[in-house]
From Swiss-Prot:
Involved in strigolactones biosynthesis by catalyzing the isomerization of the C9-C10 double bond in all-trans-beta-carotene leading to 9-cis-beta-carotene and providing the substrate for CCD7. Strigolactones are hormones that inhibit tillering and shoot branching through the MAX-dependent pathway, contribute to the regulation of shoot architectural response to phosphate-limiting conditions and function as rhizosphere signals that stimulate hyphal branching of arbuscular mycorrhizal fungi and trigger seed germination of root parasitic weeds. This is Beta-carotene isomerase D27, chloroplastic. It holds the Pfam family D27-like_C. The lineage of its organism: Eukaryota, Viridiplantae, Streptophyta, Embryophyta, Tracheophyta. Its main location: plastid. It comes from Oryza sativa subsp. japonica (Rice). The keyword rRNA-binding does not apply. Its cofactor is Fe cation. One of its GO terms (biological process) is strigolactone biosynthetic process.
Length: 278
């Protein structure tokens, strides 16, 4: 009887002895699971943040692609090989411009002419800029020659075509290569237009204000007042071309005078501090 009781009690006693150990094991297992879960969560978080990286990389790549496209789209600067006559004419006009403005520079060639124009554009008011250029043009040609041309070549088909042809032969050093084109004057075809595919002066400055105040306005005034020939200069600021139409009066509401300067491409403003408002 005692043996049976002992045998029956042993399993219960054994079970009772095992429960604390099992509970401890379960607790340790639970704690380890919690710890592992926490560690996994912490380790997982840094991996969640880079998920947006591809989007940023895509945006950066797109921006770089845009910049590269714009750079690739920019046309290369025209290279000019000036002859001895070109250099002589450029130096002569540059010196007259410097004397009229009182602003000297030590540069050579076309760079000297552009530097003289930049100095005028930086310092003087818009009206004064055109006045100085007109004075420089009058200095460049003796008054008796101007008077002789004005008297001997009154406005006519011949004089209009003569001025156009003369410009294409003797002034490519100033404006770049150009050619004579036809237009209709009083119902007749005349070769009175000079077409400049890319103006050298405009390309060198990339400035609308300098084009209008230091070239277009004073040249129109000088040719009409000193040579007796009406002329309308019509620049195209999209492709830097220009047309000189001899015999045509500039319109009062000239669209070129309303054109804002290039916001990001103006070399004169970005590199030389020119106020290119027109």
């Amino acid at each position: 009887m005692e043996t049976t009781t002992l045998v029956l009690l042993l399993p219960h006693g054994g079970a009772g002895g095992v429960r604390p150990a099992a509970a401890a094991t379960a607790k340790r297992s639970y704690v380890m699971r919690r710890c592992c879960s926490t560690v996994r969560a912490v380790m997982a978080r840094p991996q969640e943040a880079p998920a947006s990286a591809p989007a940023k990389k895509t945006e950066t790549a797109a921006m770089m692609s845009t910049v590269q496209t714009e750079t690739a789209a920019a046309p290369p600067a025209t290279v000019y090989r000036d002859s001895w006559f070109d250099k002589l004419a450029i130096g002569y006009l540059s010196r007259n411009l410097q004397e009229a403005s009182g602003l000297k520079n030590e540069k050579d060639g076309y760079e000297s002419l552009i530097d003289a124009a930049l100095a005028i554009s930086r310092i003087f008011s818009l009206d004064k800029q055109s006045e100085i250029v007109t004075q420089a043009l009058e200095r460049a040609l003796p008054s008796y020659i101007l008077t002789m041309i004005k008297v001997m070549m009154p406005p006519s088909r011949f004089s209009r075509e003569y001025f156009a042809a003369f410009t294409t032969i003797f002034f490519p050093w100033l404006v770049g290569p150009c050619e004579v084109m036809e237009s209709e004057v009083e119902g007749r075809k005349e070769k009175n237009v000079v077409y400049i595919p890319k103006c050298r002066f405009l390309e060198s400055t990339n400035c609308v204000g300098m084009c209008t105040n230091l070239c277009k306005i004073p040249c129109q005034k000088f040719i009409q007042d000193s040579l007796g020939m009406k002329v309308y200069m019509s620049p195209n600021f999209e492709d830097m071309s220009c047309e000189m139409i001899f015999g045509q009066q500039p319109p009062e509401d000239d669209p070129a005078l309303k054109q804002p300067c290039f916001r990001t491409k103006c070399v004169a403003k970005q590199n030389h501090g020119v106020n290119c408002s027109i």
